[in-house]
Amino acid sequence: MHEPHLDRRLFLKGTAATGAALALGATAAPTASAAPGGFPDYTYVRTLLTPSQLAYNPTGEIIFPTVRGVYDRLPASGRLGRYYLYYAPHDAPGGICLAYGDSLEGPFREYPHNPIVSNKWSPHYSVSHVSSPHVMWHAGRKEMWLYFHGENTTTRLARSTDGIHFTYDKVVLNTSMLPSGTTETSYARVFPHELPSRVAHYVMVFMVNNTTNHRDIGWGWSADGRTWTFAQEPLVRHGDVGAVNVGGPHLLHRNDSTYVVYNKDKESGGDLMITEVGNDFSLRRHLGVFYDSRGSAPENGRAAAPSFGTDHGVPYMIYEAGERLAGAIAMARG
């Protein structure tokens, strides 16, 4: 499968990488078998987190993992492990959670004080739930930037110097910034990506829904990661790939081009799909299935919301496995 694009150190190191690279966005190490776009194929290995085994388990489900290597970003004295894995329940009250480990193979240990961000944060908001954590390392600020939603109409930003304790920043996306009739703007991921023609250094991809109740992939661009401009037309439409709904997008970069990987709803196949958008986001080349979800547990016909990283040169995909709102966090190896 792929690798992420924005923090290029990961995959640009390819097979020569000796440390684990975070999965913000990079170029994947070559393998004998390749997925569309020349990315390595990923094969399911094991489940990393199961709701029933977690101390903080308000709803019996967890979604939307983001894995980040912190071994060379955070001071060793306060670091819990080489990798931080963020995830959340979705249903109320949700809550942004953290697990940590020293290898992308696992095991990951639950942070004992989850949730690290809750659905009530006075005086900033009080909502039914917060979920879908995406954490980006901001190299210029030397901070971990957390993008998350709550409600599904609103995507927010909080910032941290240690990846655990966050300070609220602002709303970065809500339905009022998209065309009339938009009902959801959530499940966002943000990546460093240069768009010179738009004077932008960051790109956001996210799920957008409207009154037709068919979910598409939206996108936007920003000079600073805080103030955004959003395309008023979807980046990927559900009908373009034969789905009722698409979501969980992630950018990847390989062979001097940019791709978006995203999931279909289970009824439409439950697979991860890939579309080449190009470095300037002018392409719409739908390349088909990126990862074919298995019918057996834990996937049970659905894989979603992938995050990517490398560990000692080996590419990994950490993703949501199983029925919508009944799944676990799984790991596949390239």
Model-derived regions: residue spans:
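N-terminal secretory signal peptides
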Residues: 1-6, 17-24, 33
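Beta-rich carbohydrate-recognition and catalytic domains
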Residues: 34-128, 136-186, 191-243, 253-300, ...
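Short, solvent-exposed interaction modules
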Residues: 133
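Donor nucleotide-activated moiety binding/catalytic core segment of transferases
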Residues: 246
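Extracellular glycan/ECM-engagement signal in secreted proteins
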Residues: 303-306
